[in-house]
């Protein structure tokens, strides 16, 4: 396919135009008085969102070159979302402001490479400053504040996430599900829970709630498919003599063996429940190993030279209580702290070493199941459109709280960046010169963009608000919700330091790339043909 090649100023201006469009669509959502954006969907109802990265992903322009600009600035939002999980709108607004400032300087003859060096040095200085000003998150009140701000000033959500975090600990997993009611509810599971339920409903012990509850059971864990009754009989005899219930976790249990278990259960010979092993492939093996360590048993696997028919009671695990529903199994075990701790440490090391985001997520899930537990927030709303919007806001809020716990909190509402403007200006003038100084100064000027935009979205003059904030102490900022200047920590308007830092770093990275661009190569649009589609031989040529 033929390509168009555009050089220097023309190329940068085309990129800028694409960025202007995306930045404006995203920036309207910034702050407590930010508006929503409606996204048309080819299938299903339109989606109403207030989330920067979701809007950025939807925007596709007709002009190929402008679309390249959109893709670049979208990267700043996506990368911030991947790193910190929130702050995508701030990253977009910052990147746009830096590009606008930078292009003026490049047009005036500044050297783009020297500008880039200046930008990088200024960002490094600012990252250190943000870390200096960050306060650690000590109590659930601070967590609730971070979550509430991130969810669009929803205090109820803030309280719920703080409670979930309190229950499952810092390494626990908080997951979101679409609820069935109008209200959003929190459900916390103690112990290890995995997404596999009983194989047959005949195993239930509580017919009203349709769940099987086993008190102090033995747990048989195997990675093989159980097909023959002969394999199971020795195991069942040993457990029946011990007089305790039995939970079987296996790859699958075929008809004949399953029928034997059901008959034993119905006759009252043995209280037994069978579930399929969670996960797939290597992940399944790892999860079975986790369950074995948690319950003090071992995985009966032919790879280890262990056969089911020779299994003895001392290779079974045990738990205080097991609850099995049609979709989930929850194991509450105790007494194996040392082994569990060692396993958690091993998983933590794997998390540090892996590069794949998906693997990280799955390892984090395993760690949570072993160490803390799992909290599920069931998102409720009147309509599906509202539910999707709430779900996105909650996702941001959960990510923001995790980021806050990691690196602490700083004054929110664009305040931190605005207060750092004089500091970075002073530092740059003392340490840099020439075009590097110009690069650092363009970063300094761009830092006011998020606060300016928050004020404008609240119907105020952004530049006046920015100047007023800069005159005040570091923790004092502009509360757009109530149109007042307040101490941000006291008012609970805080941002995770990690979110502010990531937004700044990713915005600067994209701005540097755009400023150092000298040519763009894009596909030439195909000429539109005026001929009707398809030659002869269509359906219309025939009489039926």
Swiss-Prot record:
Pfam families: Cpn60_TCP1. ATP binds at residues 29-32, 86-90, 413, 495. It comes from the Bacteria. Residues 525-544 are annotated as: Disordered. Forms a cylinder of 14 subunits composed of two heptameric rings stacked back-to-back. Interacts with the co-chaperonin GroES. NCBIfam families: GroEL, PRK00013.1, PRK12849.1, PRK12850.1, PRK12851.1. This is Chaperonin GroEL 2. It comes from Synechococcus sp. (strain JA-3-3Ab). The lineage of its organism: Bacteria, Bacillati, Cyanobacteriota, Cyanophyceae, Synechococcales.
